[in-house]
Each structure stands twice: as C-alpha cells, then as structure tokens.
C-alpha cells in the first residue's frame, strides 16, 4: 500500500529535489511532479526520477481544446510517467481525447498512464465555487457531477477531497480511483487548502491514493515523517 502514498515534490528546481531525495536512498517512492518543477526542469526531471526508480504522477492539470490535449497527452505518455491528470471542467470530448493521446503515446509493451480528472481544487470552498466560479450547486453535487462525467468519458478516476470519497464510491463504484491531496498530520498547519484530512482519516473514508507534501517535505526529518504518514495510511500500530 506504500505505493499508493504519493509524495508531492513541490520544489522550484532539481537541486532541491536531489537534496530531499538524499533522505530516501534505496527507497522507491511514488512522487508527484507539479507545474513549478516541470516547467523549470522540463522532461529531464522525469528522466532523472525514473532512473532513480521512482513512480511519477505528472500533475499538470491539462485544460484546453480536445485536439491540443490529445497531442499533449501523446507527448506525456512517451515520458513513461505513471499518472497524469486533466480538469474535468474541460468536458467529455476533451477527456476522451486525453485517453486517445495516452494510448497513442505510451511506450511499446506498457500500459498507458493512469488518467484522472480534477473535480474541484482542495482550495475551493463552496462559497467561492458559487460566488466566483458561478456553479449553483452544493460542492458535493458539483464534485459528484464531474466524477460521473469523468467515468463516462473513460478516465480512471478523479482528484478529490477525502471528504468526498464516500459519495463518489456510491456514484462511480469501488473500482473508480480517488486520489486525495490535502493530507496533513494532525500536528500540521493546513496552509492554503480548505478541505484537508489526516492519513488515517483518508484510509477510513476509502481513498485509493493520498498525496502528501509539506508534512513530509518540510519536516525536520523527512524520512521519519514519511514513515509516520505511511504507518497511519496503512493502519500500522507502533
């Protein structure tokens, strides 16, 4: 189950990544590479991480016209990443095009990357969604709508809050992948995310994967913090 614990490499460049990963010599991680790091270092950072034996969630949240997304996904699949994502708000045609691009670009003999969609960012509150985005639904209804559309479009799952997982299991079934960021240890600050949970709570609510950033990357001892999160996520009593 440790491979369903994703560590967010929210760093500005490769030097910071190298320094962080020194704490994990010999440990094969599942890491998330986001916009900041990928836009700075480009595909070379993916090659570097793959050579180290790590699995990669390339978190670029594509949202564009279908043809552009298809072409972009073809390129991303050729990098041999393990997971990618789009914004569900891009619509069904765009999401279907994403899958087509991944199938065309995947390396020979390998499965395409897992493809998930963002429903609502964990920084989005219901008030913000209604007043600023203009969606006149409850947050739960909006997330469920996007999740259902995602499944119908052939994607593997969604990025969502842990709090939304039980409802999505009802709507989309137990095989539908739920990747949940906003994970913090109980002692941590929540920072800029509104809908957060502990690893233990994420496990109880049925998340497929959890994404953990600052609780590990900003810890005085990242390896020990990783082990603590892993134990809580796996339900290990120490």
UniProtKB/Swiss-Prot annotation:
Q: Which residues form the signal peptide?
A: none
Question: GO terms for molecular function, please?
Answer: orotidine-5'-phosphate decarboxylase activity
Catalysed reaction(s)?
orotidine 5'-phosphate + H(+) = UMP + CO2
Q: Does the keyword Translocase apply?
A: no
Record-annotated active site: 61 (proton donor)
Question: According to the UniProt record, what class of enzyme is this?
Answer: lyase
Q: Which EC number(s) does UniProt give?
A: 4.1.1.23
The family database entries (PANTHER family) matched by this protein are listed as: OROTIDINE 5'-PHOSPHATE DECARBOXYLASE
Quaternary assembly? Homodimer.
Q: What is this protein called?
A: Orotidine 5'-phosphate decarboxylase
């Amino acid at each position: 189950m440790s491979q369903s614990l994703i560590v967010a490499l929210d760093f500005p460049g490769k030097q910071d990544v190298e320094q962080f990963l020194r704490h994990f010599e010999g440990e094969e991680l599942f890491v998330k590479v986001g916009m900041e790091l990928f836009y700075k270092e480009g595909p070379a950072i993916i090659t570097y991480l793959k050579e180290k034996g790590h699995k990669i969630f390339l978190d670029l949240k594509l949202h564009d016209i279908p043809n552009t997304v298809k072409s972009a996904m073809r390129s991303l699949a050729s990098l041999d990443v393990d997971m990618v994502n789009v914004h569900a708000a891009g619509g069904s045609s765009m999401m279907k095009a994403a899958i087509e691009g991944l199938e065309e670009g995947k390396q020979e003999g390998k499965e395409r990357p897992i493809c998930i969609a963002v429903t609502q960012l964990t920084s989005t509150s219901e008030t913000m969604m209604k007043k600023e985005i203009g969606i006149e639904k409850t947050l739960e209804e909006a997330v469920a709508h996007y999740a259902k559309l995602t499944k119908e479009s052939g994607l593997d799952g969604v990025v969502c809050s842990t709090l939304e997982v039980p409802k999505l299991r009802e709507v989309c079934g137990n095989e539908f992948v739920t990747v949940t960021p906003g994970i913090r240890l109980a002692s941590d600050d929540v920072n800029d995310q509104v809908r957060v949970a502990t690893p233990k709570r994420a496990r109880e609510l049925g998340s497929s994967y959890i994404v953990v950033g600052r609780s590990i990357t900003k810890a005085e001892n990242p390896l020990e913090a990783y082990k603590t999160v892993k134990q809580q996520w796996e339900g290990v009593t120490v």
